[in-house]
Amino acid sequence: METRRITAEEARKLAERRLTAEERVCFDLFSLILEREDALCRSDGAHCLLAQSREDTPLWVWLSHELPEAAEDEAAAGLAESLARCPALHVTLDPDRGQGVLRKAAERSGLTPETVLPMNVYACRKLSPLPLRGHAVVPREEHRPVMATLLRQMALDAEGQEVPEAAAADFAQAMVGSDRLLLWEDGDIRAMAMIAHIGDGMGRINTVVTERNSRGRGYAGMLTAALCEKLLAQGLTPMLYADAGNPSSNRAYQKIGMEACGQVTEYRWK
C-alpha cells in the first residue's frame, strides 16, 4: 500500500491502533507533534508513520516490527520527499528497524545519513527508594542567574552548542514560579530539570542538568525522582530520552526505577 498524506487526527488514531505501549513511550514526541492540526503526516495505514510539525522541524518515523519490503520502500520514498524540501532535516527512528529506510532514502536523495544522537528511552511506573541529600525547590526570582547558567552549561556540554546569554536569561525569567521546572538545593542549587510536555498519559522530562562542580553525586537522579513522583501522583507515566553515550546518567535513571523501553536515534543528512 502506498503512503499518503493523512491528517493529524488520522495519525493519532493510527498511533493508538498500531503502536504498542512501549512504542508509544519511545515515540512520545508524536503526542506533541500531533497536537497541531496542521502537522505534516504520512502513512501507509499500517506499517509506517512519518510526522513533523513543519517541513523544517525534526521528522519522527515509526516503523512496524515486521516491516514488509513494500512498506519500507514507501517509507523511504516519503523520507526522500521530505529531504528534497529540507536537506537539513533531522530524522529520528528506531535504529534497528530503520536501516533499510535510511539506505533507500539515501539512494533516492543523494544525501548520506549521519548519526547525531543515539538515545535510550525510559519510563517510570514505580519509583525505587533513594537516599536524599537536599530537596527540590520551585524556582524563585533569585534563581534566575543559576537557571540561565545551568541551561548554557547543558547546551554546551551535551550538544556543543552555545546558548546566547539573552536567550538563557529569557528562559530563566519564564521559569520563575513554574510548576513544571524544579531545582535541587543542597546548600547551593545543584541541578535543574523540567517537565517538557504532558500528553497521551505521559509526562516527558528533559533539560536535566547538574552544575558542573556537583556532578557524580546523584543530584540529577534525586531531582528526576522528584519530578517522577509529581507526575505519578497525577496518574501520568514519566518518561525521558537519555543520551546512550552517557553511562552515568543512564545509571542514575535506572537507579530511581526507570525502565528501558527501547532506543531511537537522531540522524542528520549530508
Residue map of PLM features:
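Short amphipathic alpha-helix that is part of the acyltransferase structural core
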Residues: 1-26, 127-162
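Conserved donor-binding loop and adjoining core beta-sheet/short helix segment
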Residues: 2, 28-87, 193-206
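A conserved beta-strand-loop-helix scaffold within acyl/acetyltransferase catalytic domains
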Residues: 53-55, 163-166, 170-209
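Acyl-donor-binding surface of acyltransferase catalytic domains
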Residues: 55-57, 63-133, 267
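Residue-level recognition of the GNAT/N-acetyltransferase active site
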Residues: 64, 211, 215, 243
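Conserved acetyl-CoA-binding loop-helix of GNAT-fold acetyltransferases
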Residues: 69-82, 210, 216-233, 250-255
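Conserved beta-strand-loop-alpha-helix junction that forms the acyl-donor binding cleft
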Residues: 92-99, 239-254, 266-270
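Conserved active-site tyrosine of GNAT-family acetyltransferases
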Residues: 102, 106, 252-253, 258
